[in-house]
Amino acid sequence: MIKTTIIASIKDLIKDAVKDKFKITIDLNDFVVDKAKSIEFGDFYSNVAMILASKLKKNPILIAEEICEYLKNHKTNLFESTEAVKPGYINVFLSNSVKSDLFKQINKDKDTYGIFEPKKVAYNIEFVSANPTGSLHIGHARNAALGQTLGNVWKAYGYTIEQEYYINDGGNQINNLGMSVFYRYLQKCGKDVQMEEDFYQGSEPIAVAELIYKEHKDKFVNVKYSATKIEDEKVFDFFRDFSKTELMNIIKKDLKDFSVHFDRYFPESKIYEMKLVDPTIKKLGKYVYEKDGALWLKTTEFGDDKDRVIVKSDKSFTYFMPDIAYHDIKATRTINGLKTDKIFNIWGADHASYVDRMTVALQCLGFKKDIMHVIVMQMVKLTKNGKEFKMSKRSGNSLTLRDLINAIGVDNSRWELISQAAESHIEIDVEKFTSADSTSNLSYVLYAYSRIQKILEKNESLLKESKSYNTDLLTNLKEKDMIAMLFYYPQTIANIAKSYEVHKIPIFLYTLANLLHSYYSEVKIIDESNKELLIQRLHLLQCVNQVIKNGLKLLDIEAKVLNK
């Protein structure tokens, strides 16, 4: 397991150097150590001297030189050398010793390379949370991919994670679903009835109605009903609850097939069954007041543009109130014995305006402002032959998660939905995956994995007889660059755990694959005239493939050998 990253180790040494040379303490977050943009200038670099220049009133290049002098005089197996370059950067060249240790660690850890020691940090992340009124559409697919991948990264970083799906079953939409299924059932029984305009027109109500008909035949054909309600409450409840359960079963199956799982499904109806709203109102205390027969929440106390109604004058709750109660439940839970440090939501851009309102509500409950973080994602567009599919559940024209899987497969879907920042719009061109001469970014990465795997298989006996992991002959710049990338993999996980930018996993993997393909094209890897060099290269390739495999696993994509 990873205790610390190479960057953290370099930062600690630089911090010690600053304290020794300049008698001041610098915060680790105040300066950068990162992978060098070009391997010619070192494996890593730091801007610490330029950060200190104004404080020390000194030329940054002179500061950098003094830090390099400290690092040179204090023996460490980390560095081959360091150099100060204008205007004040410090370039770091890693030693062969630490590179050899890296190869040993990767080959020892294998699938767990990049997994950190457990930390006492617990997060709840709620995502997807689609109304159980139809199949998940491709917007939900992106939400699911983001949430699951972020959960995977946090777990790899050592956090305790609870993944949650909120079932919105408390509103009128579920009643409409039940009536939609009832009308389809009547049609199945031979009745000439027309669906109401706000009913769900998709295939799911038809499928559920057929299940009911198969079990009960025409048992309910003569019940009395209006446009929006079945008079017999038990029959109405049956159609509503049965429909909700069946739709949730469809959703759960699609999520499972998409490699997405949840630790908890929490229905909104449970909030009412357990009478959790009134205690939440009481907890809001002084921030609740009555006006015009309604209860208002004084959200303006925390910067909202206006106060919000939480209980209407007819004593019914606004949709805001059960949401407040639900977020209170999440924020006060323990997760595997740990208090919840932060709650996360992934919402579509159409809910962006709701973020500040919910943040303020949690402050009214006594939580810190940063108890909740919301990742707002943009929509997804699927095109084929230049035409866009439109989405509307009620009209039955929704492009579903299942459609996406059928069109381009689970692995391609997961990659494409993660490969851009959440705030960016995504357009997926189906032709890219169905045309024989097209290459997707995922296939490019898998092709790199495949190339390496075939080389390793052909040289399996040579690898087995080698007991050491030397790196002194790996002097090619692309070899050095790949080694630096291997060092950087755990840091990538650490960065994403704090920035939530999961699209940086595909970027990392594509960059590593690109290096491999370039190396493969330019270098005669299998050079049998130099056995030691060949062994070192094989060990490098072995490590590269392990990191590709581990990185893909964070996306729930299996590393597999392509046949081309």
UniProtKB/Swiss-Prot annotation:
Belongs to the class-I aminoacyl-tRNA synthetase family. NCBIfam families: argS (TIGR00456). It comes from Malacoplasma penetrans (strain HF-2). A motif ('HIGH' region) lies at residues 130-140. It is found in: Cytoplasm. Its EC number is 6.1.1.19. It catalyses: tRNA(Arg) + L-arginine + ATP = L-arginyl-tRNA(Arg) + AMP + diphosphate. Keywords: Aminoacyl-tRNA synthetase, ATP-binding, Cytoplasm, Ligase, Nucleotide-binding, Protein biosynthesis. CDD domains: ArgRS_core. It is an enzyme of class 6 (ligase). This is Arginine--tRNA ligase. InterPro entries: aa-tRNA-synth_I_CS, Arg-tRNA-ligase, Arg-tRNA-synth_N, Arg-tRNA-synth_N_sf, ArgRS_core, DALR_anticod-bd, Rossmann-like_a/b/a_fold, tRNAsynth_Ia_anticodon-bd. One of its GO terms (molecular function) is arginine-tRNA ligase activity. One of its GO terms (cellular component) is cytoplasm. Monomer. PANTHER family: ARGININE--TRNA LIGASE, CYTOPLASMIC, ARGINYL-TRNA SYNTHETASE. GO terms for biological process: arginyl-tRNA aminoacylation.
